[in-house]
Amino acid sequence: MTMDDFKEILKEARPSFYQYPQPVRVYLHWTAGHYYTSFPEYHICIDADGEIIESLPLTEIPQATWHRNTGSIAIALCCCAGATAYKGDPYEVDLGEEPPTDAQIETLAQVMAAISDIFDIPIDNEHFLTHAEAADQDGYGPETTCERWDLAVLKNDDEWMSGGDTLRGKAIFYQQIAWGL
């Protein structure tokens, strides 16, 4: 789907989020699967070439982030089959043979900017979190059991836990371009 199509879907779904007492939260994942496969646990999947796929209507509650699904939008990059991370100093990371592509990363940032604009929420780490960041807050992330470390890094040699900040920075950049700043 095109970015314009995605924005229309967001506009249509926005009223359904008014029933929740808190502002929408957006959780950013990878599928831990292969390129060109989408999963119904996420509202939006982004393929290796940057294609946006609606895999679950935004009006439905996803099954993507433990205890954080109600009133949320779940987005996943289709990648990272076989990815591994080992706690150490520094962490040992291998994003597998299908790591996040540049096209996926840039499309995700553009999707984040669109959500921010249409839902009128800031691009910050309260409203846009990687699954690694959310899992750390809930005790099952990289700093504890390391069950979920989605997008802790975007490239094998990135600084550990830099993925969320990188994505938010890119999303702000795309938002400023759209606003003509």
Question: Which ranges hold each PLM region?
Answer:
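N-terminal catalytic cores of peptidoglycan-degrading enzymes
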Residues: 1-69
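Basic/polar, cationic surfaces and motifs that engage anionic cell-wall
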Residues: 1-20, 83-181
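Structural preference for beta-strand elements that scaffold enzyme active sites
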Residues: 25, 72-74, 127-129
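Residue-level marker of positions within ordered structural domains that often coincide
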Residues: 33, 49, 80, 113, ...
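Peptidoglycan-targeting cell-wall enzymes and recognition modules
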Residues: 45-103
